[in-house]
């Protein structure tokens, strides 16, 4: 894990459908620091993560990663609301795809399958999984390859208590190794975040 992991937003603004979600938002995260993003539905939590991930355009401002020689998308793992799994593929086939695509290591996926209790299900089509099992499968990509920046949108949704603990431990370990994390979550997590950002619903014009 690069010890130079960092992420900064400089006076960024987001506009969706002609509505300003947030404006002049700034933060700076150094190695080992996490940012917890909270706020009501519609305040822009998902939009913020998608902007950082390069999936939505900035209305104003700029985003910077720690290593300017590497494109920002190559520095992060993004787990959004949609699990991003192929229903027709087995759990193992989904995981193998992430390892190949991310040029990662299958040993990390093996560990994730064990910790999330997915080993006995690995040969089943992902479409047969429950909502919680699909979420656990989606989160295994965090273990498929080392990326210094984690962007997680409601990562604990549909998870049971034991799996939330696994997630908590994974985020804490990532930060302890010098990584950076931006997490939007309604569910309380035990991870100690260095910073918290509370977004508010902007009044309609």
Each predicted region: which residue ranges?
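Conserved ABC ATPase "signature" region
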Residues: 107-122, 140
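Hydrophobic anchor residue at the start of the ABC signature
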Residues: 139, 178
């Amino acid at each position: 894990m690069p010890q130079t992991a960092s992420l900064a937003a400089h006076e960024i603004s987001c506009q969706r459908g002609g509505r300003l979600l947030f404006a002049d938002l700034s933060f700076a995260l150094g190695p080992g620091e996490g940012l917890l993003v909270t706020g009501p539905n519609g305040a822009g939590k998902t939009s913020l993560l998608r902007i950082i991930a390069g999936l939505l355009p900035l209305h104003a401002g700029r985003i910077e990663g720690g290593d300017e020689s590497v494109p920002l998308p190559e520095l992060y793992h993004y787990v959004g609301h949609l699990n991003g799994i192929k229903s027709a593929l087995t759990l193992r086939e989904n995981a193998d795809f992430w390892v190949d695509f991310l040029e990662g290591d299958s040993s990390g996926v093996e560990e994730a399958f064990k910790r999330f209790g997915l080993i006995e299900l690995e040969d089943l089509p992902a479409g047969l999984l429950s909502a919680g099992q699909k979420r656990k499968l989606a989160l295994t990509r965090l273990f498929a390859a080392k990326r210094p920046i984690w962007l997680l949108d409601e990562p604990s949704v549909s998870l049971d208590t034991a799996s939330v603990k696994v997630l908590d431990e994974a985020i804490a370990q990532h930060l302890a190794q010098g990584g950076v994390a931006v997490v939007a979550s309604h569910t309380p997590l035990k991870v100690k975040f260095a910073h918290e950002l509370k977004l508010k619903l902007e009044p309609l014009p």
